[in-house]
């Protein structure tokens, strides 16, 4: 399976930041198109009601771009998307619209009652996504649960 495009949805959490960095490196290594997406969700946790929509889109694009170096921005020329709605639904819709080959997203790894009450956007996406989904945990959580940080080999060796 050739990976020609990678979608990285974010909620600007620590786990999403880790996924964004991982997805960016994969896109660079594989020569894939990169799509960066933000969905504020129904609660609008990061949504500023004071922003007119155009300014909010610009602010979102700038924030997404801030995770990439100038060289990465020039090489990848990412596409940016801002969607409002239920995050899992919007991620899946956008992946279908753009014919994405891989979704790379963060997961909080909740379990038990927190998972039952809060649900999991990542789990919802995995269940209905039109392509494979790679879940990435935040580095601190991964290190805490496994005793040490694990260096991930370059994506080309994994996929190619």
Residue map of PLM features:
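Small/aliphatic-rich secondary-structure junction motif
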Residues: 1-54, 139-141, 151-160
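Short, solvent-exposed amphipathic alpha-helices that sit
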Residues: 22, 55-67, 90-92
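Gly/Ser-rich helix-loop-strand patches that form or flank binding pockets
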Residues: 25, 94-144
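Short helix-capping segments at alpha-helix termini
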Residues: 70-76
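Rossmann-fold cofactor-recognition segment
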Residues: 78-80
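Charged docking surfaces used in two-component/phosphorelay signaling
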Residues: 82-90
